[in-house]
A protein has these predicted regions:
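Formylglycine-dependent sulfatase
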Residues: 2, 7-16, 20, 26-270
Length: 270
């Protein structure tokens, strides 16, 4: 864990405070001396597991540093909450119906305009880590991406069109590859825009092998709705809606004063 934290600190010290939205990226590119841009994405990462928002579960000092030195959003939304379509929205600045990528089975149309293409004349652009758009990246001078969802252990990457299997844990590898590009492979005459996209903590939520027992003796309180069973709820809702029609019929036939209207549930489940 400490090994990864040290590397994360090193990445954060390359020259970025925070890059959190496309308008900010556009303003960076339009400056007389453009700023470096590092866009870090973690997958299916709930805000409750970032200690800048909630300290109940885990400490995340480097993410907290970004929040403290930059901006923390307390009321934010995504254009699409599905993994790959959300990535397409990020690249294009367009809603899913406009960019053509509506679910995880789609193929991203790389011929359309994206923000890396818009800044590529000024920036050395790269994406490293999870891509998940079922096509080769466009608008990047360098790309080194996981295949599909990617594997947590000994994952296979595609580096500028060439498959490479790397030994180790996906998060560590992605970080190492990013550091190597930043320090030794990019065009240092230009500012950089690096999209560093991690697979973790997407299900199956597998950690580095050294962290497998990190929370072995920890107890986390379950939410009140954890054991809720939603089976049959839709049918119950529709039944409730039909009852309103039955009641309307009773009143329309002027039977309300003459009859008793009774509803019961034999199993008391709803």
């Amino acid at each position: 864990m400490n090994h990864l934290l040290d590397k994360t600190k090193k990445i954060l010290s390359v020259g970025l405070k925070s890059a959190l939205a496309l308008p900010f990226i556009a303003s960076c590119a339009n400056k007389e001396k453009p700023m470096n841009i590092l866009f870090i994405m973690s997958d299916d990462h709930s805000y409750q597991t970032i200690s800048a928002y909630d300290t109940s579960f885990i400490r995340t000092p480097n993410l907290d540093r970004i929040a403290n030195e930059g901006v923390r959003f307390n009321n934010s939304f995504v254009a699409n909450s599905i993994s790959a379509p959300s990535r397409a929205c990020l690249l294009t600045g367009k809603h899913s119906l406009a960019n053509g990528f509506t679910d995880n089975n789609c193929t991203f149309d790389g011929s359309q305009q994206t923000f890396p293409k818009l800044i590529q004349d000024k920036y050395e652009t790269a994406i490293i880590g999870k891509w998940h758009l079922n096509s080769d990246p466009t608008g990047f001078n360098h790309w080194d991406i996981l295949i599909g969802q990617g594997d947590y252990y000994n994952p296979t990457f595609i580096r500028n069109g060439e498959k490479i299997q790397r030994e180790g844990y996906a998060t560590n590898i992605t970080t190492d590859v990013a550091l190597e590009w930043l320090e030794n492979e990019r065009d240092t005459e230009k500012p950089f825009c690096l999209l560093l996209h991690h697979k973790a903590p997407h299900r199956t939520w597998m950690p580095d092998t050294c962290d497998l027992k990190l929370f072995k003796d920890s107890n986390f309180p379950l939410p009140e709705t954890f054991y809720d069973n939603y089976e049959g709820r839709l049918a119950a809702k529709k039944n409730k809606m039909s009852i309103s029609k039955d009641m309307d019929l009773v009143y329309d036939l002027k039977l309300a004063d003459k009859d008793s209207l009774i509803h019961s549930n034999p199993n008391l489940e709803y």
